[in-house]
């Protein structure tokens, strides 16, 4: 069985959480591992009308048969970790989760630095979660690791070993990234970026998967890209236009209103190339065409929605395998058999 990596192709908030949740329930992976930066990105998913948001744990938590892992490349905030264990207790998460013992720790001092730094908080628009300062300490080799925190001892493991053992045994491993391509420290709109790379290559490294062991890379785009905080946004629309179209969203972590823009085909093509996308996922198609809401059969999509998907495939050069047509998990069109 393969390893599948899911990453964002825009500035985060693409709907990765809903795609990961669907894959977790539909494909039933044995392991769901989280890569990415840390608690500065929130993934949300709607289950039976109830919205769940996670910042530390894998978004595929609702697949109760899966082992949930947090890779060594991810920053861990113990306060957030234990809050989410309690928040998700109905899913028996505490019995299934493992944190790599090498994860660096976000301490209160890191969050304070993040929020009080005028440049980071005012100019860049950081989430204030402490990830930047914690990663800086990690680079300087002074950050604490998960193995140094006594409360985390019951959850410590070697994630890289677990993941590779699972792949050796033919298990399916689902790996989720955070944020999006436009926020990559290397390839994003620097300096208005996050504190590390966010591409599929980096996410694979975060959990200890070598390049030759990655089978599929799904890059997620939403019909109207959004951005929280400062930084270039070439296709941004006026807030009044977003209001008129009903495109009003708020960040999962910051609570700040998201800036909204038109779909950027050039950026999408570049993101797909750098991430090595084998397929694309398009979310919020119902925002682009309200008549597409809740449809689960591609042939039943209205013409406007179909033409948009076809244009994405043609201009980006990668097939669309998954399409979200609403907020619920079942609001999805799965075209992977056709790829």
Curated annotation (Swiss-Prot):
The reactions it catalyses are:
IMP + L-aspartate + GTP = N(6)-(1,2-dicarboxyethyl)-AMP + GDP + phosphate + 2 H(+)
Q: Which pathway does the protein contribute to?
A: Purine metabolism; AMP biosynthesis via de novo pathway; AMP from IMP: step 1/2
Name any one Pfam family assigned in the record: Adenylsucc_synt
Transmembrane region(s)? none
Keyword Ligase part of the UniProt annotation: yes
SMART domains per the UniProt record, alphabetical:
Adenylsucc_synt
Q: What does this protein do?
A: Plays an important role in the de novo pathway of purine nucleotide biosynthesis. Catalyzes the first committed step in the biosynthesis of AMP from IMP.
Which protein, by its recorded name, is this? Adenylosuccinate synthetase
